[in-house]
Design a protein with these regions (language model features):
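Residues that cap or anchor secondary-structure elements
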Residues: 2-213, 376
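Beta-strand-rich interaction/scaffold domains
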Residues: 278-342, 363
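Non-cytosolic beta-sheet module surface loops
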Residues: 127, 139, 245, 276-280, ...
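Short beta-strands within extracellular/lumenal beta-sheet-rich domains
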Residues: 118-127, 133-137, 246-264, 324
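Surface-exposed acidic, glycine-flexible loop patches that form ligand/cofactor-binding
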Residues: 260-267, 332-336
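A short beta-strand element within beta-rich, extracytoplasmic domains
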Residues: 135-140, 150, 254-256, 265-281, ...
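Short structured motifs
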Residues: 108-111, 120-122, 240-241, 255-259, ...
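Flexible, small-residue-rich N-terminal segments that precede or flank a structured functional core
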Residues: 194-261, 293-296, 348-351, 355, ...
């Protein structure tokens, strides 16, 4: 995503849409008045406005004194030589990229390409013969703890809230991305210093990694998979939806954090659609199922999930998105008021060796977008 406004223009196929004034400064939301006297809110899964000055995050580096600078939604980011520094009120994190890489910069010719996200950086690296990336990370104060698996690593401020997360995305430039192609391994040096090794399979030509300071998210979600039935991907920025003999079946559970849209909760709602970015070319048909019971994004795994459902939602796809119409999950058909959704689960429609790589609610480079159209 190069700009939240440009992304909305692309979704609407409208280069001249006029934004409504953000009176309440909902940091996640852009609004547009429609010709039929309705208003559409585009709510991003992470904040798009800076917490201090209220300005829209500018997804471009500036240069000063030989460094790259970026101001995210609640963090300041500085890139000096091969070190990225991310700083906010919760902590200061340094990421040192292996010095064996000869070029580090913000242009596509570099071996390591860095670009700003909404609250951090995305690292894209051309895969070398060693087939791995090494990152040294440290934090200025001992964190409450850490959480990690083969998909992400997080410094935690307490049990469920990260300070900072590194998450592997994969290779967006190959036709079919499979689970297991990218693995994140962690080695502790001490309680503030860690080595991160991101190992890549032979099929990958490049790999992408997101490094972000945490913000509260709109979509509370996690993937579950039968290959690792006691794990989930709570803080990972990408999800793989699909099924296959070698890597098993993978689903995505999700629900709305209603506190983030409290300024429009009392409106009469016309429609609610969720735009989930597609991160690779492969299309796997998916279905959204409305859950009968509330799920916990923190503790849900393949072994303990309850995916019983009441109805399904229409899902279509474009070149950039899966679009899920969840109006029936979230709106009372008679009163047109919001009803609390217990959650939904995305599952592949058919069995077979097919996987799609998509963004989760923790993605700061290609965030999910909730489109809510309401009557004035």
């Amino acid at each position: 995503m190069d700009s939240p406004i440009n992304e909305i223009n692309r979704i609407r196929n409208d280069r001249k849409c006029v934004l409504r004034s953000n009176e309440f400064l909902n940091r996640y939301m852009l609004e547009i008045d429609n010709k039929d006297l309705t208003t559409t809110s585009y709510v991003f899964s992470v904040p798009i406005f800076n917490i201090t000055d209220g300005n829209l995050v500018n997804l471009k580096f500036s240069q000063e004194n030989g460094c790259l600078h970026h101001t995210g939604s609640n963090a300041d980011i500085i890139v000096r030589n091969n070190v990225v520094c991310l700083k906010n009120s919760c902590g200061i994190v340094h990421i040192e990229i292996s010095k064996s890489e000869k070029e580090i910069g913000s242009n596509n010719m570099s071996m390591v390409n860095l670009s700003p996200t909404l609250n951090g950086v995305k690292l894209r690296k051309v895969i070398n013969k060693e087939k791995f990336i090494k990152l040294n990370i440290d934090i200025n104060e001992t964190p409450y703890g850490i959480k990690f698996n083969e998909k992400y690593f997080s410094f935690m401020s307490h049990d469920i809230t990260p300070i900072f997360t590194i998450s592997v995305i994969g290779d967006r430039y190959i036709e079919s991305f499979t689970p297991g192609s990218v693995v994140l391994n962690t080695k502790a040096i001490d309680d503030r210093h860690y080595e991160i090794y991101i190992e890549c399979s032979d099929e990958l030509k490049t790999v992408e990694v997101e490094c972000n300071m945490y913000e509260q998210k709109l979509m509370l979600d996690t993937t579950v998979e039968n290959r690792r039935p006691d794990e989930n991907n709570l803080y990972g920025a990408s999800a793989i939806i699909g099924s296959g003999e070698k890597y098993g079946e993978q689903w995505l559970f999700s629900k709305i954090n209603y506190g983030i849209i409290r300024n429009i909760l009392l409106k009469r709602i016309k429609s609610v659609r969720l735009f989930i970015p597609r991160l690779n070319k492969k299309v796997t048909e998916i279905t959204a199922y409305n859950l009968m019971r509330r799920f916990c994004s923190i503790g849900t795994t393949w072994n303990n999930n309850d995916s019983r459902s009441t109805n399904t939602a229409k899902t279509v796809f474009t070149d950039s998105y899966y679009i899920i119409d969840i109006t029936g999950f979230t709106v009372d058909s008679e009163t047109q008021n919001f009803i609390e959704m217990l959650g939904f689960v995305l599952k592949p429609k058919c069995d077979g060796n097919s996987y799609s790589l998509i963004s989760t609610g923790d993605c700061y480079d290609q965030p999910q977008i909730l489109e809510i159209t309401y009557y004035n």
